Amino acid sequence: MEDAIERLAEHVVNTNLSDIPNKAIQSAKTYVLDTIGVGLAGSTGPYVKELLNTYSLPSLPQVTSRVLGQNVKLNPADAALINGFQIHNSEFDCVHEEAVIHTMTVLLAVIFADADRRGGISGSKLLESAVLGVDVACNLGVACSS
């Protein structure tokens, strides 16, 4: 008998963009654009320069990933951290109230950094990743708060 985690993993692995309802795809497009917008706005927010100064060390390996609104590339983990900070620092990022999670902040910061590391991804793969990530994160959040 498979457990809930196995079912969740199978759902993610076996779901393609064509399986996702159009309404979810349209919502994802809106939320991706919104998240990019608040991330760019947050690029001039408090403590961003301090974070960039801390994480912009030239000796770090795998400097491949861009930071929103900044003329800098960092290793993927650091770029994801700073992008997430910038997206969230003005508190205009979207939140799933029931799951109590800022899903797009966490997911897109990582998706963008990983896409740069890989040399890019298609828009459809970005949307598929975002929709499935939101699905997993929100369901786990709701399960934990129930």
For the regions a language model picked out, list residue spans one by one.
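N-terminal core-entry segment
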Residues: M1-S146
